[in-house]
Every structure is written in structure tokens, then in C-alpha cells.
């Protein structure tokens, strides 16, 4: 039987960006420093090792971890996602309002999931993976086991005041200690 929502821990931890990755810049990591992991995501090479270990252990438990194509994002991809999902028109913004400031202007989320300001995404450091959660067992497995491989979420489903957190992305997991 799948775990109920009440039993989830929603493990959250802020990542530390490795200095060896910072030298290239967000979204500018050389191709030779990236690797395609077993789940299908292209990530920073040290992240791929932990991701592959997690993949095979999940498989042993009957869970197949699959990426939704959400691994490394170069700067151009981050910018394209930004313009696709964000707008300067507050009236077009999705409720509750998700806003970000970029280039001195306030932008509002118009559709889909929140997106980081270009050049600040953990995908741009090759640290994050977006998993396919179409099988409910996948999230339950990640919630329970991913932290032991160094993978955490970046936001909980609710804010401290109990309101829904519009920044919650259950599919988005980041290696915090690459």
C-alpha cells in the first residue's frame, strides 16, 4: 500500500554549489563535465554517480526512476523557459502570484511550474533532476530514500502559515553536496 500524504517528510535542504562548478558559471558547464545518468538526466559528473547508485537501489525496490528531461540546462535553455513561463503583466499571472525579479523588473508566473531566474537555476549547475512522478511509488521512494544519496527538495508543499506553497515542485530534486 502506498504511503499516505501525511506520512511524507518532504526533505528540504539548501544546496552548496561546488567551487569547481562555479568557475564555469551557471548554464556554462563544459559538455565533458556532464554525464547522462541511468534515469536519463544529464548532470554534473559527480552527481551522475550518486544518481546512478540511487537508480539501481530504487530498481531493487521495484521503482524505476525516470527523468522528465529535467537535468542540466544551459543558459539559453533557462532563458527560453523563462520567457515561456513568465510575464511582466501582473494580470496574466497565475494565482497565487509567483513573482521573481530579473533585470530590475518584476515578472509573474503565467503557466506551468515556477522557473528560476536565468543564471540562478540549480539545473544550470548540473545538480538538479526532475523526476517522472506518474507512478505514485516513485515519490514515496524518493521521499524516504533520496536524502541518503544527498538529494533533497527545495521547498515544502505548504508555507509556515499553512498556505499552499506555489514554489513546491515534488518532481524537482537537487544534489546538495556534489
Where would I find each of the regions flagged by the language model?
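Cell-envelope/glycan interface and biosynthesis
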Residues: 2-178
Amino acid at each position: 500500500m502506498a504511503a499516505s500524504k501525511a506520512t511524507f517528510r518532504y526533505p528540504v535542504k539548501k544546496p552548496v554549489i561546488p567551487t569547481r562548478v562555479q568557475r564555469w558559471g551557471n548554464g556554462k558547464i563544459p559538455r565533458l563535465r556532464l554525464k547522462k545518468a541511468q534515469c536519463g538526466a544529464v548532470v554534473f559528473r559527480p552527481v551522475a554517480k550518486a544518481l546512478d547508485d540511487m537508480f539501481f537501489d530504487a530498481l531493487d525496490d521495484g521503482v524505476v526512476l525516470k527523468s522528465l528531461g529535467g537535468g542540466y540546462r544551459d543558459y539559453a535553455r533557462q532563458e527560453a523557459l523563462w520567457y515561456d513561463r513568465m510575464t511582466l503583466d501582473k494580470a496574466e499571472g497565475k494565482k497565487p502570484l509567483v513573482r521573481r525579479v530579473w533585470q530590475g523588473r518584476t515578472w509573474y508566473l503565467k503557466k506551468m511550474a515556477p522557473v528560476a531566474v536565468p543564471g540562478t537555476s540549480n539545473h544550470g549547475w548540473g545538480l538538479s533532476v526532475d523526476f517522472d512522478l506518474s507512478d505514485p511509488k516513485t515519490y514515496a521512494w524518493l521521499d524516504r530514500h533520496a536524502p541518503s544519496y544527498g538529494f533533497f527538495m527545495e521547498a515544502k508543499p505548504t508555507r509556515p502559515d499553512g498556505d499552499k506553497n506555489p514554489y513546491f515542485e515534488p518532481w524537482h530534486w537537487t544534489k546538495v553536496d556534489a
